[in-house]
C-alpha cells in the first residue's frame, strides 16, 4: 500500500516523454562523458549502460524530488551515498525556480503536505 502512496504522490509526478521515461527506467543518474551523444536526438537526455544523465534544466527538479522521496518514504526509497551526494550537488547548483514554488503551493493545498526541499527556498 505504501508503494501506491509513493506512486501517486504529486511531488513525484511530472509530465514526461514515455519513450524517454521507459528507457531511463530505474537507472542511476550520473554525469556521463561528453563524448556520449544525446540518446533522443534534440532531447538532452543521455543514457549509457545502467546510467542516465538528464538535461541541465531538469537536474535541480530531479534532485529535490529524489530528496523529498527519501525524506517522505525513508523505509522504501533509498539512495546510495553516491546518488545522495549527486542530488545534493544538483540541488545546490540548480536553484528552485518560481514555477516550482507555485507548483508546490498547489500540491500542498491538494495533498496536505509540503516538500521542504522546495518550500524552504520559496519562503525566502
Please annotate each region the language model reported:
Residues 1-124:
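Domain-level detector of nuclease and nuclease-like folds
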